[in-house]
């Protein structure tokens, strides 16, 4: 199996930090025989983890294609790597995808499919008083990197309840820090709450006695929203249509496989952490984390558009409006380009 992992990860309490080291950042690599894929070492990214580990993707793209994996802990970092042409396809949340699409004027990114729905929660300290909106003044609440999906959701939730962060003249301290740092500060009692994805949400509950105030999907229509999307770099997609087509087919096959083999999928995820990170998560954390999300290839388009509306209301999308036309890959509209490429 032609798979290489371009990362070294250390684990503190469970996962302490991620150091990203690219095997190659060259945009001059021959792209016909390699696909560089980015994802996170987290439950919501079960599709690439399980599908690569059990060989579905390798069989789908063929043995002549090398799959090079790169692990990240931040969506905005993934998008910057897309811009640097060091990644070809990636699994990432809607917030960074939207920002990246607009930053590139719609030229660099296409959404191919969904990968997960749900899987984020608002976790609070048991004595924080955050179970009542009246008690938010002066509280310290964390989310991962600014403008990522959880950050947008947290800030929109505050705005929906007539609250503002300190930097906007409000009364709530919003801290944008990495998931491992959120874990550390929560353990020390230095933050009152955190809006985080799985498995971090369940780790805060099971290991640090946090209280899950609610799962984010409870705030969405039909209790579903796109939390992880499969995207491709547009020029890679145009230059390698058959490879991307096979990747997408394998992606959908993996979604079906995971939903039909839940226990084995959890076992594969646990083995992945042990093999690539040196330590896994307790089985009970993996079980609960998986139960808090849905693995799906549906991008839930309306939720992506709603994310954009919310990000725009927070001032994340600039002052001149935004246009997401073309963000979703439509194979029929790209048929001519594909035929041209396949015919040489």
PLM regions and their residue ranges:
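Short, glycine-/small- and polar/acidic-enriched structural segments
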Residues: 30-176, 192-198, 213-214
